[in-house]
Amino acid sequence: MDYKALGLKTGLEIHIQLNTRRKLFCHCPPVLRDDEPHFRVERRLHISVSELGAVDPAVVWEVRKRRKYIYEGYRDTTCLVELDEEPPHMPDEEALTTAVAVAKMFNAKLFDEIYVMRKTVVDGSNVSGFQRTMLVAYGGRAKILGYDIGVETIALEEDAARKMGEEGKAVVYRLDRLGIPLIEIATEPMTYAPQQVEEVAWIIGYSVKITGRAKRGVGTVRQDVNVSIAGGAKTEIKGVPDLSLIPKVIEYEATRQLSLLKIAEELKRRGVEKVELSLADVTQAFANTKSKLVRRVLDAGGKVVAVKAPGFNKLLGAEVQPGRRFGTELADYVRAWTELGGLLHSDELPGYGITADEVRDVEARVGVNSFILLMGVDEGELEEAARVVVERLNAAPRGVPEETRAANPDGTTRFLRPRPGAARMYPETDLPPVRITFEILKKAEEVAKVTLEGKLKELTSRGLSRDLALQLVKSPHLEKFEDYLQRFKEVPPQQIAAVLLNISKALAREGVEITDEKVESVLDALNRKVITKEAVEEVLRNMKPGESAEEAAKRLGLLRMSYDEVKKIVAEVAAQVGKEKAVGEVMRRYRGKVDVEDVRRALAEIYL
């Protein structure tokens, strides 16, 4: 795919939990708990205008779902601030210092005074109905690893409550995560290829982690990706779970937008401008149906209704992403706005047990050959689903609607909610502005001294190539490497890195279980000069449970020969094959048991 010709633009929003002693707006500890909660409270959210007198479209969408929210908490680690029963405390200075330090890393412009804002969030993940956020800096730019990274904004905000599950129409959240400090770094639009965007995301995340002030583990970093192509629209894709998925998400979203533009072009060619909301009860067409899907609804007292989609013949089944069609997009809308499980459309029928005769019967009843079938018991839900479908059909001739979408595990995306409007953000009335003091700046400057480029320089100064140093930094083994450097001082840094990055990975691909204990035992044997570096892979491959590297080497006949033994062997081999071929021949005959440096030294001494 020629992304330049497509006019691909991407943006990143990287959210990283900070490792602080308290939450951002209260003094509760920022810990997640799995034990039984001490209490539960129930809340409902209601729509109202913001302090600016406007209503956000995303709010309208969420409130119409009429959900109840249940919050679980602990008396010793959650408080009234999380329950929105007490005003927020002043922001945590430790978190603010980290945000200022990150701003300095990216040469962003700091605000002298920071205002706490309320960002409307009505999916229940914030008890108050809004998330408190502070814009710390803007307009940053840094060149790191050859990438020119423009940073639009750096914000400090509170994380949302943790979703634990659903109970019917109620969503259950746990308050332990609510209020944990979160730094959000939003980039300027980029024209990099998808693979390069993944690299940029890693650079940003690592730049925060290297300060030692970021939390580690699953769920501590979240990536949102904004994607658009020429003629398309900005689409925000929430919750890309893994950096490696970013290229696929971008590729598939570009494909989706291109497909939607082609559908729009075809609709214009067909003269389709507007679809009228027309709902026809076609239950009788399925009176004798053998379709299990339809029969289940009818047996429950439900009915089947058809929504006319004139002009959409063969377009409802058009693929927009791998395994997803335009009809899937419509089904996403239905699932998002109602409790219905989805829909069927004429391009996929006959199918699902529905016969050609039943399809012809429906066509006769609605008067068109392209239609949407909705099934359910609740008439209100069916009417709402029909309205949503028609709205999305009417958006199709305009191309790509602005949406917030969610990432699927395979890199495709699904509709989540409409894009929020400007009415989403307004000032926090319970807190005064926060000044960036000289003390905060001084502390932040110290934190900002630790950089990615600085870490790479430190590693290359130890003898690692830049490529190997970068591999190590990108791996989860950097802390182990630094620990092993101190513990196994006789093992060259390059050898430690090779064991962690290359040998362990190659053996794991063979199905060999590699544990920290095995690696440490092998490095200890190397450190004591019990084995050679050539024997490492074979020893690791064949170590039995509970066996040390030295014991395994002895069993395998791979204990390192003493220097006197090596010298004797070198003299014998050199006499047989000559001085020039002696090193290679000794290594061939005794590989794994002799160290090449010992062989060279012995040869040099013999022929002095």
Swiss-Prot record:
Region annotation (Disordered) ranges: 401-428
Annotated GO MF terms: aminoacyl-tRNA ligase activity; ATP binding; glutaminyl-tRNA synthase (glutamine-hydrolyzing) activity
Alphabetical keyword list: ATP-binding, Ligase, Nucleotide-binding, Protein biosynthesis
EC number(s) on file: 6.3.5.-
Signal peptide range in chain numbering: none
Coiled-coil regions, chain positions: none
Enzyme class of the recorded protein, top EC level: ligase
GO biological process entries: glutaminyl-tRNAGln biosynthesis via transamidation; translation
Complex and partners: Heterodimer of GatD and GatE.
Primary role: Allows the formation of correctly charged Gln-tRNA(Gln) through the transamidation of misacylated Glu-tRNA(Gln) in organisms which lack glutaminyl-tRNA synthetase. The reaction takes place in the presence of glutamine and ATP through an activated gamma-phospho-Glu-tRNA(Gln). The GatDE system is specific for glutamate and does not act on aspartate.
PANTHER family found in the cross-reference section: GLUTAMYL-TRNA GLN AMIDOTRANSFERASE SUBUNIT B MITOCHONDRIAL AND PROKARYOTIC PET112-RELATED, GLUTAMYL-TRNA(GLN) AMIDOTRANSFERASE SUBUNIT E
Record-stated family: Belongs to the GatB/GatE family. GatE subfamily.
UniProt protein name: Glutamyl-tRNA(Gln) amidotransferase subunit E
